């Protein structure tokens, strides 16, 4: 049976429930925990990663911005874990769904804007009008800056969706080509499998980079409004 190219991005269900819930909640249960060794290798690596994330994200923030430390750390770990799990065979990647990415981007963006309007409304509103703007251009620039402000969460979600989806589609195409050529040309199949392996390594890096970019942009929005 021939499948559509976008079949892997259809949300699967198990007993009528979205399988994305299992993908998100089940993997943490597989991580071994030690009741006797507090500072084992896994804990040390986790602490090192958290310190690295906080150093990269929160250095330029003030006291109000640093209250978001736990949120941003959890966000980057969640997106990175979801992207990496989606690279496993016969798995589903929730971040290929624009609806899910919008559900993450819009509340975070709205929270940063609300924070700016609450604590420094004048400075936040002055961002809508660049300093030194000629008087005839003021109405048009206010409209342009307002539209660009409301496009920010859409850009966040579309960027993550497009990058993850494009990589999965390319892997699907190359994998299908390798399978089709298996009985036709073995040397060419080996070359294709080598390309697929390299692409998988690249997609692993992209999965981590996109999680970092998404969280970094949220951090920048927070910095502008805190």
Curated annotation (Swiss-Prot):
PROSITE patterns: ATPASE_A
Keywords in alphabetical order: ATP synthesis, CF(0), Hydrogen ion transport, Ion transport, Membrane, Mitochondrion, Mitochondrion inner membrane, Transmembrane, Transmembrane helix, Transport
Topological category with respect to the lipid bilayer: Multi-pass membrane protein
Protein name: ATP synthase F(0) complex subunit a
Keyword Hydrolase appears in the UniProt entry: no
Assembly, per entry: Component of the ATP synthase complex composed at least of ATP5F1A/subunit alpha, ATP5F1B/subunit beta, ATP5MC1/subunit c (homooctomer), MT-ATP6/subunit a, MT-ATP8/subunit 8, ATP5ME/subunit e, ATP5MF/subunit f, ATP5MG/subunit g, ATP5MK/subunit k, ATP5MJ/subunit j, ATP5F1C/subunit gamma, ATP5F1D/subunit delta, ATP5F1E/subunit epsilon, ATP5PF/subunit F6, ATP5PB/subunit b, ATP5PD/subunit d, ATP5PO/subunit OSCP.
Family classification: Belongs to the ATPase A chain family.
Domain of life: Eukaryota
PANTHER family according to UniProt: ATP SYNTHASE SUBUNIT A
Entry GO CC: mitochondrial inner membrane; proton-transporting ATP synthase complex
Gene Ontology MF term list: proton channel activity; proton-transporting ATP synthase activity, rotational mechanism
Segments traversing the membrane: 12-32, 68-88, 97-117, 138-158, 182-202, 203-223
Main localisation: mitochondrion
Gene3D superfamilies on file: ATP synthase, F0 complex, subunit A (1.20.120.220)
Catalysed transformations (reactions): H(+)(in) = H(+)(out)
Pfam family for this entry, one: ATP-synt_A
Function, in words: Subunit a, of the mitochondrial membrane ATP synthase complex (F(1)F(0) ATP synthase or Complex V) that produces ATP from ADP in the presence of a proton gradient across the membrane which is generated by electron transport complexes of the respiratory chain. ATP synthase complex consist of a soluble F(1) head domain - the catalytic core - and a membrane F(1) domain - the membrane proton channel. These two domains are linked by a central stalk rotating inside the F(1) region and a stationary peripheral stalk.
Any GO BP: proton motive force-driven ATP synthesis
Compartment(s) of residence: Mitochondrion inner membrane
InterPro entries: ATP_synth_F0_asu, ATP_synth_F0_asu_AS, ATP_synth_F0_asu_bact/mt, F0_ATP_A_sf
């Amino acid at each position: 049976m021939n499948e559509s190219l976008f079949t892997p991005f259809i949300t699967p269900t198990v007993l009528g429930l979205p399988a994305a819930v299992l993908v998100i909640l089940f993997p943490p249960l597989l991580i071994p925990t030690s009741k006797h060794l507090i500072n084992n290798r896994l804990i040390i690596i986790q602490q090192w990663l958290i310190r690295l994330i906080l150093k990269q994200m929160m250095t330029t923030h003030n006291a109000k911005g640093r209250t978001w430390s736990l949120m941003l750390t959890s966000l980057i770990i969640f997106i990175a874990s979801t992207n990496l799990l989606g690279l496993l065979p016969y798995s589903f990647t929730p971040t290929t769904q624009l609806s899910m990415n919008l559900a993450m981007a819009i509340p975070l963006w709205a929270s940063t804007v609300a924070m700016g309007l609450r604590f420094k409304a004048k400075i936040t509103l002055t961002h809508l009008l660049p300093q030194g703007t000629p008087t005839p251009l003021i109405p048009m620039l206010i409209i342009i800056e307002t539209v660009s402000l409301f496009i920010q969460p859409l850009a966040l979600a579309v960027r993550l969706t497009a990058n993850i989806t494009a990589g999965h589609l390319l892997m699907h195409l190359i994998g299908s080509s390798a399978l089709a050529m298996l009985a036709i040309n073995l040397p060419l199949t080996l070359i294709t499998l080598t390309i697929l392996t390299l692409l998988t390594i690249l997609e692993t890096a992209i999965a981590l980079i996109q999680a970092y970019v998404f969280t970094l942009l949220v951090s920048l929005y927070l910095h502008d409004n805190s």
